[in-house]
A protein has these predicted regions:
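Pyridoxal 5′-phosphate
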Residues: 3-204
Length: 204
């Protein structure tokens, strides 16, 4: 999830931020879904706005509407807390963010193993999870992105099979998602994660 959050922050969000723009991040976030936004805010002059917790120790999504302004650009929120195991009302949070034209990044590291999010029904722009939280190997995970969002993203890393052609005058990249797979892929990790997902499906 850390790599995924950073890739979304740097490759999709950063080129679209201007000084004074706002990134709303819930107070319940693991720093994997906080630090990338603090970094991109520092780089662009944007600012991170904290979505506070409610009395139940979950993000107060009912208060989100009051935080959204014409400068709000991104909502970063976790599917499930890594501390309490509590789950915010994602549907309500996303509806408010999407109504304001915001991009939504959901950290699914904790929740994916328990109840995978329906990314299309919830209208999630980006959703990330880690392999080891699904009984798979470490060092592997996945990032979902809407096809139109991925098509608008520039590559974060370069080299390997993410290009179709390269000369000293320039290069051409593969279409998404392959242009985000620079270098030799984690082949063993992919096989291990695939086996873990198959096991989860069989035992569900």
């Amino acid at each position: 999830c850390i790599r995924d959050s950073n890739m979304v922050a740097q490759s999709y969000v950063r080129p679209r931020l201007k000084p004074g723009d706002e990134i709303i991040v819930s107070e319940a976030e693991h720093h994997a879904n906080l630090v990338p936004w603090l970094m991109v805010a520092e780089q662009t002059g944007a600012r991170v706005v904290k979505l506070p917790l409610a009395g139940n120790r979950l993000p107060d999504v009912a208060a989100l509407g009051a935080l959204i302004t014409p400068r709000s650009r991104v909502l970063a929120i976790g599917q499930m807390s890594n501390v309490t195991g509590g789950c915010p009302d994602l549907a309500l949070a996303i509806r408010q963010a999407r109504a304001a034209g915001m991009v939504v990044m959901v950290d699914g590291a904790q929740g994916a193993v328990h109840f995978p999010a329906d990314v299309q029904a919830l209208d999630i722009d980006f959703y990330a999870f880690s392999g080891h939280k699904l009984y798979g190997p470490t060092g592997i995970g996945a990032l979902y992105g809407k096809s139109e969002r991925l098509a608008e993203m520039s590559p974060w890393l370069g080299g390997g099979k993410m290009i179709t052609d390269v000369t000293f005058d320039g290069f051409k990249t593969q279409p998404a998602p392959w242009r985000f797979e620079a270098g030799t892929p984690n082949i063993a990790g992919v096989i291990g994660l695939s086996a873990a997902l198959e096991w989860l499906e069989e035992t569900a």
